[in-house]
Structure formats: structure tokens, C-alpha cells
């Protein structure tokens, strides 16, 4: 067998029989789960937070201008300033990302907690004890008969 054929066989064994398939499935499911969590935060949690706080939790347009380009007369918006070359400390965007992270972590925590709780309930369901093997049953009957004989 040539080295190329051996390499191809080795790669096929790795890709098909190894953990590569499990890893690929995990990555695909993880990506899909990420979209679910992202939608849950953006489409459900954030609107509720915005409603409760009475406005938008978006500080991305809060910033501190450290230096302006000479002769700049455009709007004082973050996107316009950075496009013009202004040195801007975007603290508001940082705060918004932190808030989003905390909310996302909170949602994931509750989802995982619910999944583990459901698993524990499944595991906690007691199984009916298995019937003893026939030889054990026969030995118990013999024991009981011997006890009865000794007692009489």
C-alpha cells in the first residue's frame, strides 16, 4: 500500500469513525442554539427590559470626544465623528455590550437550569426493582422451608 493510499485511509477512518462527526454535529447544533438564544435576548428579553425601564437600553451613542479633526463642522454623532477621524472614547457602546452580555448570560443560565431540572426529574423517577433471578427465588423458598421445619 502506498503512502498516499495509507494517508487517505487514515483520514477516512478519522473523519468517519472518530469524533469528527460528533464534533461537527455539536458545532451545527451549537450554532443553531446560538441563534435561538440571540433571538430570545433581542426579540423577547430586550423589549421587556426597554418597556420596564421606560426607554431603550442603548447607550451606543454616548461617547467622549478626545480630539477633533481640524475644521470639522459635521454632526456630533459617533459614526460621523469616527468617519471624520476624531479620537472618540465610546464608553456607551461598551456599557451596552456589558448589559447585553449580562442579559444573555442570565437567559442562558435559566435555560440550562431548566434543562438540568428536567433531567433530574427524569433521573429521580424510581425504577421498579428487577425481579430476582429464578435460582435466588428457589434458594429463598428452600430457606423458608428449612426455617419452618426447624420451627415445628
Curated annotation (Swiss-Prot):
It is a multi-pass membrane protein. It comes from the Bacteria. SUPFAM superfamilies: Gated mechanosensitive channel. PANTHER family: LARGE-CONDUCTANCE MECHANOSENSITIVE CHANNEL, MECHANOSENSITIVE CHANNEL MSCL. Belongs to the MscL family. Channel that opens in response to stretch forces in the membrane lipid bilayer. May participate in the regulation of osmotic pressure changes within the cell. This is Large-conductance mechanosensitive channel. It comes from Bordetella parapertussis (strain 12822 / ATCC BAA-587 / NCTC 13253).
